[in-house]
């Protein structure tokens, strides 16, 4: 008997979510964004911020922020609580975001990934993203960033 995965609820983030998002971001990245930095994207035209919760959890376990301009968009950040990884949270966030971006007229999504982050690379490649460039020594720890492009 096959069981389905968890139910993942996606909703738009608002200013009141900035502290929660900052806490998730801090747990995921050495150079994290604080609530003020995250809040600077919330409610801004051209920015989309989504939160994911595994039902019936009350607190979000992941989020993403994308910014669009013209027919292109950029994934600014995606963070998922470590305890909830590999449960489909990032995939659900990306599916919701790409659907919204498509609906708004975006044709392509760009993002940077640490060359050593194989889980993220695998996820984006599974969605059809391809490497289109590289930013040498992009991260503070000296790693390069691969630039991915995903046709929407």
Please place each PLM-identified region on the residue numbering.
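Conserved hydrophobic/aromatic "anchor" residues
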Residues: 29, 63, 84, 123, ...
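Conserved catalytic core of the tyrosine transesterase superfamily
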Residues: 1-2, 47, 108, 114, ...
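Conserved GNAT acetyl-CoA-binding A-motif
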Residues: 101-112, 135
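Short glycine/proline-centered loop/turn elements that form peptide/ligand docking sites
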Residues: 94, 117-120, 137-142
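Conserved catalytic-core motifs of GNAT/GCN5-like acyltransferases
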Residues: 36, 112, 125, 130-146
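Acetyl-CoA-dependent GNAT
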Residues: 2-5, 12-87, 91-104, 151-152
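Residue-level recognition of the GNAT/N-acetyltransferase active site
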Residues: 81, 114-116
């Amino acid at each position: 008997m096959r069981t389905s995965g968890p139910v993942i609820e996606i909703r738009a983030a608002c200013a009141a979510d900035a502290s929660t998002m900052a806490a998730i971001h801090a747990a995921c990245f050495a150079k994290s964004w604080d609530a003020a930095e995250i809040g600077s994207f919330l409610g801004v035209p051209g920015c989309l911020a989504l939160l994911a919760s595994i039902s019936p959890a009350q607190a979000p376990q992941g989020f993403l922020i994308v910014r669009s301009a013209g027919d292109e968009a950029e994934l600014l950040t995606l963070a998922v609580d470590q305890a909830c990884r590999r449960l489909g949270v990032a995939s659900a966030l990306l599916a919701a975001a790409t659907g919204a971006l498509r609906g708004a007229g975006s044709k392509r999504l760009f993002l940077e990934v640490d060359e050593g982050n194989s889980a993220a690379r695998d996820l984006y490649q599974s969605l059809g993203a391809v490497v289109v460039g590289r930013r040498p020594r992009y991260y503070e720890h000296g790693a390069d960033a691969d630039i991915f492009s995903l046709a929407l």
